[in-house]
Amino acid sequence: MKAYQRQFIEFALEKGVLKFGEFTLKSGRVSPYFFNAGLFNTGRDLARLGRFYAEALVDAGIDYDVLFGPAYKGIPIATTTAVALADHHDIDMPYCFNRKEVKTHGEGGSLVGSDLEGRIMLVDDVITAGTAIRESMEIIKANGADLAGVLVAIDRQEKGKGELSAIQEVERDFGCAVISIVSLGDVVTYLSEQDGMDAHLAAVKSYRAEYGV
């Protein structure tokens, strides 16, 4: 685990974005942890979040031309990532996001920002079922662009309905890399390094043994 990944886990814990306990997911599974990126909800939080996304992008070394943030959660993520790339890595990357509702006046259309062209890096908070990615793919294809990759905050490394995780299904279906700032494996490593986290570590390991990929 790299320094920025450890710092991201600490940041998520500090802000209550990453919590340990018992949480019933939409799937009905009872998870020993929960990740709610919506709690990164101040200007300072968003600025820090962008730096972690930018760090993960630079670390991954994937070639792309435009950042795309799917509405709604992806919009501030794409924006802050673009700012962080410019401020901290001297990479001036165009960004774009979509509207859920097509605008019929003014500039019109469903896209805001840069043209959606070339190789697209999609940024979002998490991939749960891959639905948002599939919807975004329709937009990307309709503009004649290609999906270069997907970046999310955390990879739960958890089976979906079959044997693959939602992220593995996206990689299989769209032939692109899906990268994350951290994975569940990184969270396990972090917990194992902390004093007083044995109960949470045991619960996460047990959950991973049952549902992990």
UniProtKB/Swiss-Prot annotation:
Q: Which residues make up the binding site for 5-phospho-alpha-D-ribose 1-diphosphate?
A: 26, 72-73, 99-100, 103, 105, 124-132
Coiled-coil residues are none
GO BP, sorted A to Z? 'de novo' pyrimidine nucleobase biosynthetic process; 'de novo' UMP biosynthetic process; pyrimidine ribonucleoside biosynthetic process
| Domain of life of the native organism | Bacteria
> What would be an example GO MF term here?
orotate phosphoribosyltransferase activity
Q: Which SUPFAM superfamilies match?
A: PRTase-like
Annotated pathway: Pyrimidine metabolism; UMP biosynthesis via de novo pathway; UMP from orotate: step 1/2
Give UniProt keywords alphabetically.
Glycosyltransferase, Magnesium, Pyrimidine biosynthesis, Transferase
- Annotated TM spans: none
Q: Which NCBIfam families does this one have?
A: pyrE
Q: How does it assemble?
A: Homodimer.
Q: Which family does it belong to?
A: Belongs to the purine/pyrimidine phosphoribosyltransferase family. PyrE subfamily.
Question: What is the designated name of this protein?
Answer: Orotate phosphoribosyltransferase
Which organism is this protein's natural source? Photobacterium profundum (strain SS9)
